[in-house]
């Protein structure tokens, strides 16, 4: 079955009670103010059709979903052996901001979708781009077809003021020789990426290349190679939801990436990209109602990569 506006609307109503459960991210003050009852879902098909329900047009802080965009940019700037010598491809099983594993594994992050891995990727972008922050913004605007997408400066500043742990991660990696630039400018870029403000519709359109063998459905241009697209989806399926990746694969069965702003993107290769948003999080830092919405959608349209 294909997704329809009626299916999405019924899912929104069914999962709405879950918005009262879970907890909005409060360690970033600007995120703590977002109303927990917000709930949206959008589907963007490989034919270019948008289907949505709930608060799908409202912008929110995409947070760790941006890690996929940073990795995509890095894939175009580095040879595979260069990229994957500095960050791994394995699930971590630890909290997304863990220092212990990083110390044990000599400054090489487990994967690009935990904080340490994404910070290394931002360090790599800093080495090859004269203005990485501007390049990322242009990249997102191009992929989404939305020229007004911007960074939420309040969120970025809020994160920078509470950046001790991420700075510790960066300095620890530098002590192992796996960080090549000044820490503070790279962290500024990292926090700005996390502070991209986008809606479910914009996110679903942005990541269409992952459902279309590396070619953007919006622009028709090649973003990454078919092999890189397949590899990115494999990483999303195993590492995209922090230490809740196994649970998500079991319940939803799609490659996905979450953020503590309450957003999740999911990919049905060859068919569509999906984005959901609900700010209240489970214990792994993933959207509680958003995960359930994706689970119901997967069941109702009969889609899974497994």
UniProtKB/Swiss-Prot annotation:
Gene name of the record: glsA
Known catalytic reactions: L-glutamine + H2O = L-glutamate + NH4(+)
The keyword Hydrolase is annotated on this UniProt entry: yes
Organism field: Vibrio cholerae serotype O1 (strain ATCC 39541 / Classical Ogawa 395 / O395)
Cited Pfam families: Glutaminase
Family classification: Belongs to the glutaminase family.
MF-aspect GO terms: glutaminase activity
EC number: 3.5.1.2
Alphabetical list of HAMAP family matching this protein: Glutaminase
InterPro entries listed in its UniProt record: Beta-lactam/transpept-like, Glutaminase
Lineage: Bacteria, Pseudomonadati, Pseudomonadota, Gammaproteobacteria, Vibrionales
Record key words, sorted: Hydrolase
Name of the molecule in the record: Glutaminase
């Amino acid at each position: 079955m294909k997704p329809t506006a009626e299916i999405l609307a019924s899912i929104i109503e069914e999962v709405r009670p879950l918005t009262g459960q879970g907890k909005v991210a409060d360690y970033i003050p600007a995120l703590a103010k977002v109303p927990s009852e917000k709930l949206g879902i959008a589907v963007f098909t490989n034919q270019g059709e948008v289907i949505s329900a709930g608060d799908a047009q409202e912008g929110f802080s995409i947070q760790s979903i941006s890690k996929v965009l940073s990795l995509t940019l890095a894939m175009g700037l580095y040879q595979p052996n260069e990229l994957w010598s500095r960050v791994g491809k394995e699930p971590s099983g630890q909290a997304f901001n863990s220092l212990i594993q990083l110390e044990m594994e000599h400054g090489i992050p487990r994967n690009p979708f935990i904080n340490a891995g994404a910070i290394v990727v931002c360090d790599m972008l800093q080495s090859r781009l004269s203005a990485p922050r501007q390049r990322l913004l242009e990249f997102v605007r191009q992929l989404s077809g939305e020229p007004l997408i911007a960074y939420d400066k309040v969120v970025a500043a809020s994160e920078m003021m509470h950046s001790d742990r991420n700075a510790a991660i960066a300095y620890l990696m530098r002590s192992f020789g796996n960080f090549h630039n000044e820490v503070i400018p790279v962290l500024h870029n990292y926090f700005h990426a996390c502070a991209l403000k986008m809606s479910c519709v914009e996110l679903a359109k942005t990541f269409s290349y992952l459902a279309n063998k590396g070619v953007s459905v919006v622009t028709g241009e090649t973003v990454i190679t078919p092999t890189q697209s397949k590899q990115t989806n494999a990483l999303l399926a195993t590492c995209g939801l922090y230490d809740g990746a196994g649970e998500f694969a079991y319940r939803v069965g799609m490659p996905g990436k979450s953020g503590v702003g309450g957003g999740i993107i999911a990919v049905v290769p060859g068919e569509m990209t999906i984005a959901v948003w609900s700010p209240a999080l489970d214990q792994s830092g993933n959207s509680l109602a958003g995960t359930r919405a994706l689970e119901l959608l997967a069941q109702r349209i009969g889609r899974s990569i497994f």
